[in-house]
Each structure stands twice: as structure tokens, then as C-alpha cells.
Amino acid sequence: KRALQSEKRRQHNASRRSMTRTYLKKVIAAIASGDKAAATAAFAVAQPIMDRMATKGLIHKNKAARHKSRLS
């Protein structure tokens, strides 16, 4: 039972981590394109997701803070 739970949790966490990285890539792509409005909008969407992942323990809170600081 524990092995099944662990595998299910691992897949769920991998999905969440991938989603987080995707949102970060969208922000970076918007910044690289030079579109300030799109970059601001993408950052506004990505910021609460980073906070949520840090709260749930998927990424360290300092890592979330570092990403937000570098992107803002």
C-alpha cells in the first residue's frame, strides 16, 4: 500500500513540478521577446503558483523567493 501511495504521490509531484517550470518558461520567453505587457501578465500568473508549490513543499521557499526576485 505504501509503495502504491508513494508512486501516486511521485507522479503527482512530477506533474506539478513540470507545470511550475512551464509557467517560469512562459515568463522568461515573454521577457526575451521584449513584450512588457505579456511579461507582466505571465509573471502575475506564475507568482502565486510558485508560492503554492513552496507552501506544499514541492520546492524550497527560498528557491521560490529567488525565482520571483530574479524575474520581477
Curated annotation (Swiss-Prot):
Keywords: Ribonucleoprotein, Ribosomal protein, RNA-binding, rRNA-binding. Disulfide bonds: none annotated. PANTHER family: 30S RIBOSOMAL PROTEIN S20 (PTHR33398), SMALL RIBOSOMAL SUBUNIT PROTEIN BS20C (PTHR33398:SF1). Pfam families: Ribosomal_S20p. It comes from Aeromonas hydrophila. The gene is rpsT. This is Small ribosomal subunit protein bS20. GO terms for molecular function: small ribosomal subunit rRNA binding; structural constituent of ribosome. Belongs to the bacterial ribosomal protein bS20 family. GO terms for cellular component: cytosol; small ribosomal subunit. One of its GO terms (biological process) is translation. Binds directly to 16S ribosomal RNA. Signal peptide: none annotated. The lineage of its organism: Bacteria, Pseudomonadati, Pseudomonadota, Gammaproteobacteria, Aeromonadales.
